[in-house]
Amino acid sequence: MTKKNHALIPIPGPSVWPLLGNLFDIDTEHGLASVLEMGRSYGDIFQLVLGGNKLVFLQTHALFDEVCDESRFCKVVVSGLGNLRAGVNDGLFTAHDGEHNWGVAHRIIMPIFGPIKIRETLGGMKDVCQELSLKWARYGPDHRIDIAGDLTRLTLDTIAFCTMGYRFNSFYRNSDVHPFVKSMVGFLREADKSSMIPEYLNAFRWKARRSFLGDIASMREMSMMILNLRRGNPSDRDDLLNALLHGRDPKTGEGMSDESIINNLITFLVAGHETTSGALSFVFYYLLTNPESLKNAREEVDRVIGAGNITADHLSKLPYIDAVLREALRLNPTGPAITLGAREDTTLGGKYAVKKGEPVLCMFHNIHRDKKVYGEDADEWKPERMMDENFNKLPKNAWKPFGNGTRGCIGRAFAWQESQLVIASILQNFDLTLDNPDYKLEIVETLTIKPGNFYVRAKLRSGRTPRELCGFSNPISTNIQIKNGTIAPANDGQVGNSTPVTILYGSNSGTCEALAHRLARDAPSYGYSVTTVATLDSVIGILPRAKDELVVIITCSYDGLPADNAVRFCNWLKTLDEDALGGMPFAVFACGHHDWAKTFYKVPIMIDELLARAGAHRVAQMGKANSAVSDMFSDLENWEDEHLWSSSSAAGNETVDNVARTEVKQDITITNPRARALHHNAVECIVSETHKLSESGSALKYHVEIQLPANMKYAPGDHLSVLPINPRQNVRRALARFHLAGDSVLSVARIGHMGTLGQETLSAFDVFASYVELSQPATRRNIATLLSVTPEGEGRYELAELGGAAFESQIRDMRVSVLDLLERYKAIKLCVGAFIDMLPPLRVRTYSISSSALWKPSHASLTISVLAQPALSGQGSFLGVASNFLADLVPGDAVHFTIRPCKKQFHLPDDASAHPIIMVAAGSGIAPFRGFIQDRALQRRNGVQLQPAILFFGCRGSKQDDLYRQELDEFEAEGVVSVRRAFSGEETVSISESRMYVQDRMWADRAEVIQLWNLGAKIYVCGGINMADGVREIFNEIVGPTEVDGKRGAESLNKLSEETMSARYVAEIFSQT
């Protein structure tokens, strides 16, 4: 025995029952799901005995890459695939390796699926695609569409019409599917199911066998009818059917027998439509459950194709659509596995023995999610990872949904073109929505997979009609511009030669996004047409590079790091060569807060420098907005007026008179029927519990528990974002100022600067409550507009002062809103449309989750500090929008939330037994640490030996806001955490709880802090900026030169490397909203 053989280890797997194999380990109705679930227990490889066959399952890229070597491994036809031979024998898909008829058919058919021939099929594909579009258009937006069913109809009709000249006319069969499809589904399902059952038991399944043979007979009869129809009606079509009938093998000179023709007709009718329809169904599932991806895909279609006829040239210019298809097939490959076998006895990975011909099933679902290839987020939907520049860098054999080598899918190019066309056509013509917003992905298994019970609704876009889909009316005017993925008429108010501008943002909290939309709103007044407003990550690899298209980027830093939707863009930007952007004009607007001095504007500055290094042309100096001392919207307006548009006007744009650039009014039609309900795209969740946490004497604090859908996952430290509703008090103020009843209906063309809404009809209450920021400080431009509609002598002088020298002290610093000014100066004659246009859209607010997902599955809790205080301006009260909204919730309320991962540094250490932790919080800043502690408690109860954890917690008083006291006492008794409280609002008898701030308590316990720090502790801080600064200052003293009991910290924070700091000391700073 060789040394190598000594290293061999057995392939793991469950125990095998005599005669039955692993039948009881598999759910025969959901075989694939069973195998995938089992695979999670065994790692990279395992084995089962099913249907009398020993099967080896591979789950990692490394092992799969090895078996893709065709000199060592070849296709093996066994199990479910082997059962298909009863219907199609040696067709292309089911032939054994080296089988003669496979070689003859393959050589005859190959030319039909060459690139030129595939392009020639586009007309036929569009013919069938039009039938789908007409069906959806005529049924209307309220019809519930079984999208997987309709895509099955489409792909069956497409393969039959384009390759055989035969029309199944599936869209004219009402709700029923063609008998061929029924037979095919039964055929595939039984082939799969019977493969898991021992042969001697299958012998007793007479009824199933009869149905199986009946399905085969039906499909062969249908195929023979198509064959005879062509023979009786000869055609000179250069298609698959004529190749099968008349082709000759260039190697042997042989033609194909009728038996072989029928085998391959069925093969193409089945394999040529079933996997494609599944792939398309998964594409639309992922697009509809990921609005940003849907927006990016639609924008690409609008930009490349517009509203015109789709051509083959268009399809070659859709990189994002290609990435979407690749990512859908990565996550859910519709042909979920291929089976290979060794040509000789060999080993895998140098340690697993496999015998010659032994079936090795390569499970694409897990291979395509290998974290060593795709990273820790391999299970997540991220089409950007499959853009060309990233896709081309993947290791070989990392993405194989079409199979391997010579036995790979011969019709891949056909399926790809068809998929591109269908996606582009549907996005071009329809707005799709989920029929059930809470739909959870279900998988229907035969030998292939597709989504089950997946229903959508389809509404024609941009006023298109079914007649236009038939080509009966004139083409839509080419005088269009694209905004936010919607096609809208070009702005008649633009002056000069309209120059395109792309506006990109990186934003976690929504502020930079709101600024981007405000800029988009302003651009037409300066002679620019906005082509898109999108996230930075959405343009990786497709950043506009034309010298006549301006790119404006608005972004910020989060503790020195990019926003979540800008991380991949920044990494990509660093890889660009000099002159890669070829003179692309650009400008950057930076947002920040000066309290983070070390990282102030760090990311915007980096982007500005990297763009210039890559050959882009800076047309204006970088704009800056410091939220600590100014209003960002005002800063943006100043930068626009003084730098951006004036600098870039040299390109040929005419500037616009200042008077013409004041706020644009819109017409609002007011009627009085009740409004329909307002819907948001976030996931609807149900409030399950609320209770007050604090007593009088401190800010009110509430505990809010939310029941989440099963597919909403989070980790301790992550965030929930909520789109709130404005306080009712403020809504009533706005209604009263414009003399509107709450149920008055506003027919609105747009809300603020969010872009075109298509004349939405909303109640006045909904508009003011759910769409706009009523408390946003007024900008100078807002005041200029108010001044222009104020009669002489009716406060004009005061308004002029407020818009001038007094702006910063009396408006910005006092946070005076437009609504405040309208109430203060009642003579202002502003229409409701102009008021709505002035206001930013209501933005999401983000809160730390105060629970562990493991503590109470499918639930998350929030810990809210309610902001309600006298307004700085002296006009009434200032109410935090989100905190008051959340505090008013009661069990049973439905609220729309999204999960936002925290920065990775704020997660708990992977190994709780290796790293101590120190948590520092004040007030509701305890939220993430409650989740940390719950998670640690569960680990301890599961036998994990925890390193020490200390929570320094600042409160006002023991009887006021000592949050979660009983719960924390129980955790402390278990040894999960040691809680050190600091009461800043009372004197107590206890020395350990004497009057102090949280940083004072840290100083008192500095010996333990130093001890844990020197043991590698990670420090987490959560609270307001003043508290965070105080904690950092005292911590710097603790770990600096000061000695305690002869011990001192390793080094001062100021001397620690940035890498060490980001890994070991991390803070989350919040503001009340």
UniProtKB/Swiss-Prot annotation:
Chloroplast recorded as keyword: no
Residue stretches making up the FAD-binding FR-type domain: 680-909
A GO cellular component entry from the record: cytosol
Note describing how the cofactor binds: Binds 1 FAD. Binds 1 FMN.
Domain Flavodoxin-like: 501-644
SUPFAM superfamilies: Cytochrome P450, Ferredoxin reductase-like, C-terminal NADP-linked domain, Flavoproteins, Riboflavin synthase domain-like
Domain of life: Eukaryota
Required cofactor(s): FAD; FMN; heme
Catalytic activity: 2 oxidized [cytochrome P450] + NADPH = 2 reduced [cytochrome P450] + NADP(+) + H(+); an organic molecule + reduced [NADPH--hemoprotein reductase] + O2 = an alcohol + oxidized [NADPH--hemoprotein reductase] + H2O + H(+); dodecanoate + reduced [NADPH--hemoprotein reductase] + O2 = 10-hydroxydodecanoate + oxidized [NADPH--hemoprotein reductase] + H2O + H(+); tetradecanoate + reduced [NADPH--hemoprotein reductase] + O2 = 12-hydroxytetradecanoate + oxidized [NADPH--hemoprotein reductase] + H2O + H(+)
Record keywords: Electron transport, FAD, Flavoprotein, FMN, Heme, Iron, Metal-binding, Monooxygenase, NADP, Oxidoreductase, Transport
Principal EC category: oxidoreductase
Leader sequence segment: none
UniProt-annotated binding residues for FMN: 507-511, 588-620
Positions of heme binding: C409
Enzyme Commission code: 1.14.14.1, 1.6.2.4
UniProt GO MF annotations: aromatase activity; flavin adenine dinucleotide binding; FMN binding; heme binding; iron ion binding; NADPH-hemoprotein reductase activity
Family named by the database record: In the N-terminal section; belongs to the cytochrome P450 family.
Described function: Self-sufficient cytochrome P450 monooxygenase that catalyzes the regioselective in-chain hydroxylation of alkanes, fatty alcohols, and fatty acids, giving sub-terminal hydroxylation by acting preferentially on the omega-2 position. Prefers fatty acids as substrates, since it hydroxylates the small amounts of dodecanoic acid formed in the presence of an excess of 1-dodecanol.
Name of the protein in question: Self-sufficient cytochrome P450 monooxygenase CYP505AG1
Organism (species): Oidiodendron maius (strain Zn)
